[in-house]
Regions:
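Compositionally biased, intrinsically disordered low-complexity segments enriched in polar/Pro/Gly
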Residues: 1, 151-152
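Small/polar-rich, solvent-exposed N-terminal microdomains that initiate assembly or binding
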Residues: 1-66, 108, 112-118
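Acidic-leaning, charged glycine-interspersed low-complexity segments
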Residues: 23, 45-49, 95-148
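Extracellular/virion structural assembly segments
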Residues: 66-70, 78-106
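Sterically constrained small-residue positions within well-ordered secondary structures
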Residues: 41, 66-68, 130-134
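Oligomerization/assembly interface segments of phage tail-like spikes and tubes
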Residues: 67-85, 135-149
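Short, solvent-exposed secondary-structure capping/transition elements
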Residues: 59-60, 85-89, 114, 152
Length: 152
């Protein structure tokens, strides 16, 4: 049983770290996406932020008894590449990193075959420029990480 939804978040982070897609993969301790974006300039040129989102639970019931629950953790990724002095950052690298993240997480079971599945749902580019910091190209990606529970 994988009802530890923080485990789902940590497993995504570990999977991306092992893939070597970015110089740094981290789950920053921030309360808002804006705070996460503001912290990007403190990280290496290529970084992936892993941020928790909503939890959703669905239940299958037969004969008045629960037989299965699907626990989904929404995860938002900020996939970023910097280019010193370039407004908008290094979009080519950010695009390539996003493709590699998509390949790595698509239907990935995070080592829990039949119990967990990653389902990337959407991705979009976002350019960010700070006045006194290098430009950053950022892609946001939403991934649904689902745990299939049959024991309680």
């Amino acid at each position: 049983m994988i009802t530890d939804t923080q485990w789902l978040l940590r497993a995504v982070t570990a999977e991306l770290e092992q893939a070597g897609i970015a110089q740094c993969v981290t789950a920053p301790n921030v309360l808002t996406y804006e705070a996460a974006l503001a912290d990007l300039n403190q990280y290496p040129a290529s970084v992936i932020f892993v941020l928790p989102g909503a939890l959703n639970v669905s239940h299958d019931i037969e004969g008045g008894m629960p037989i299965k629950a699907d626990i989904s953790r929404e995860v938002t990724l900020f996939i970023s590449a910097a280019a010193t002095g370039v407004p908008g950052g290094d979009m080519d690298t950010a695009n390539h990193m996003t493709d590699r993240v998509l390949q790595k997480l698509m239907w990935n079971s995070l080592g829990q075959d039949g119990l967990v599945i990653c389902k990337p749902r959407s991705a979009a580019p976002l350019s960010i420029v700070w006045e006194d910091a290098p430009g950053r190209a950022v892609w946001t990606m939403t991934v649904e990480v689902t745990s299939f529970e049959t024991e309680f």
